Amino acid sequence: MSLVSIIVPVYNVEPYIETCIQSLIRQTMGNIEVILVDDGSTDRSGELCDQYAEADERIRVIHKQNGGLSSARNAGISAAKGEYLLFVDSDDYVSASLVEKTV
């Protein structure tokens, strides 16, 4: 089964990021990596991402200076190991079968 890299740009989304991450780790397709790119958040977004990464080996966090959405996505692409890339915004809640149905 091919690895799917899910790239999530993160910037000051403390109220939403946990819901997003929880929806990603519940995916029915298990062969995923979640790359959270903290684009210089000034709230607790980056800290929350780190907590999830410590608890789940499928999650990686990249912390970088703020460079905007495209810069964050490009950082995620560079770090991705998957055959397929999936982009999710940090305020999204996705269905548990999103990756399985997409791939």
Where on the chain are the PLM-derived regions?
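Nucleotide-sugar donor-binding/catalytic module of glycosyltransferases
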Residues: 1-103
